[in-house]
UniProtKB/Swiss-Prot annotation:
Comment field (misc): This protein binds calcium.
Positions of post-translational N-acetylserine modification: S1
Designated name of the protein: Crustacean calcium-binding protein 23
PANTHER family in the cross-refs: CALCYPHOSIN, CALCYPHOSINE LIKE
InterPro entries found in the cross-reference section: Ca-bind_SignalingProt (IPR051581), EF-hand-dom_pair (IPR011992), EF_hand_dom (IPR002048)
Source lineage: Eukaryota, Metazoa, Ecdysozoa, Arthropoda, Crustacea
SUPFAM superfamilies on file: EF-hand
Pfam families hit by this protein: EF-hand_7 (PF13499)
Amino acid sequence: SEAKLKEAAKETLKTTTDPLEKLRSHCLSQGYSGLLSLGRLFRRLDKDRSWTLSKEELSRGVGQFGLDLSDGDINKLFSSFEKDGQSGINYEEFLESLRPEMTEPRKKAVEAAFKHLDKTGDGVVGLEDIKGKYSAKTHPKVVKGEATEDEILKKFLNMFETNTSVDGKVTKKEFFDYYSGLSKAIDEDEYFVSMVNIMWXX
């Protein structure tokens, strides 16, 4: 469950000394959409659309995200992603390394769900398309009678509305950012894959 995911991440945050693991745990302690929020923050800091962040921007972004890292930790993070001849770090690569690993069957299920939504094949889907295809009937809270399908849909759309870099649109990377957080909370591949398939009526 999301609550267990948050708790486990908070515990890791207390014990780990690795700055990348600290940031990953901090993302997961925010729930399924933590990585999505961080991605949005980085994309907003990238005013000149260079897809890179300077050390100062990285430090500011991490601070705004609510994680207090030392200068030493920021330097370590930055230097591990810095490439020769680049003036900053590529934050898409950085976010990719923060994503909890997904197994092949899970990646394929998320990939297929996105393809199902992305009719034009341009790697971007509108929130209206998501609204028309998303099914919340197997959502744990709906199954337990704690929420209606409509409430879950609104919450799901709201999460993407507040965390995407382009208003009203969701990129493939943002879609994967969300599902990698959700995947971390589910042990069995089979359950995850069937849930994604039912969610998007695939």
